[in-house]
Curated annotation (Swiss-Prot):
It is found in: Cell inner membrane. Belongs to the EccE family. This is ESX-3 secretion system protein EccE3. One of its GO terms (cellular component) is plasma membrane. The keyword Cell membrane applies. The gene is eccE3. It is a multi-pass membrane protein. Part of the ESX-3 / type VII secretion system (T7SS), which is composed of cytosolic and membrane components. The ESX-3 membrane complex is composed of EccB3, EccC3, EccD3 and EccE3. Part of the ESX-3 specialized secretion system, which is required for siderophore-mediated iron acquisition and for the secretion of EsxH and EsxG. Keywords: Cell inner membrane, Cell membrane, Membrane, Transmembrane, Transmembrane helix, Transport. The chain crosses the membrane at residues 5-25, 29-49.
Amino acid sequence: MTARIALASLFVVAAVLAQPWQTTTQRWVLGVSIAAVIVLLAWWKGMFLTTRIGRALAMVRRNRAEDTVETDAHRATVVLRVDPAAPAQLPVVVGYLDRYGITCDKVRITHRDAGGTRRSWISLTVDAVDNLAALQARSARIPLQDTTEVVGRRLADHLREQGWTVTVVEGVDTPLPVSGKETWRGVADDAGVVAAYRVKVDDRLDEVLAEIGHLPAEETWTALEFTGSPAEPLLTVCAAVRTSDRPAAKAPLAGLTPARGRHRPALAALNPLSTERLDGTAVPLPAVVRTSVKGSVEHEAAQEAGHPA
């Protein structure tokens, strides 16, 4: 927004300097400046016009491009299948943002609800840049994937000790249709449309997540992604909803924001195996989450000494 205002200000200054607008050149400068300011600051259907045009063009390019799986060689993700998922797992999971000398870029809990059945995964992503010294201390060849898997196995053992069934998996379901066409409101395939949403993180978060599960949908996805440090974690929440019909332009619930024109990358990031962060801005934990997480994280961290990864 600041850059947009600064750019518009440059055109205003150019128009002022072109006074008294008597020559053809001066009038051209005035006209172009007025048009540029209007385009830069025009607001249409919830976003700036230029943003809308940019997203539309990017969407066209993605639809024309061949389906490829983008990978980041500097990041690795390990995924755990958890049965059943429970809020009591949150403190344990958040503690692994920085555990045994390894810092995770993100730790995520993902739920898929379809046909009355829930599947849940915990994903840990390690960034080599953030852990270069720790990785070099383990091996000269920078064992990123091996180290990530070790952290995942430690978390799996930790959860098993507390009574949950945990399995390290390599293949998972994904909310993004394999051969779907992206539209402004979602990604469409023969079975319907999947739309991605950002979820507002506030004291109503638990209520909104419960409401998502009760939507008249064939399939819903929700993901809670923790970043930052165990002491001061940040949270990003996203969701995906599959319906047989085209979704409305307006979000189905208060607290949801559609990923207008960005559904494909948003859904790709929702894949539990993705190394990318969720589409959205990470914010401090709301009180309803912070109360249950913080004390337990401090207790878990006290047990870390003497257990290097």
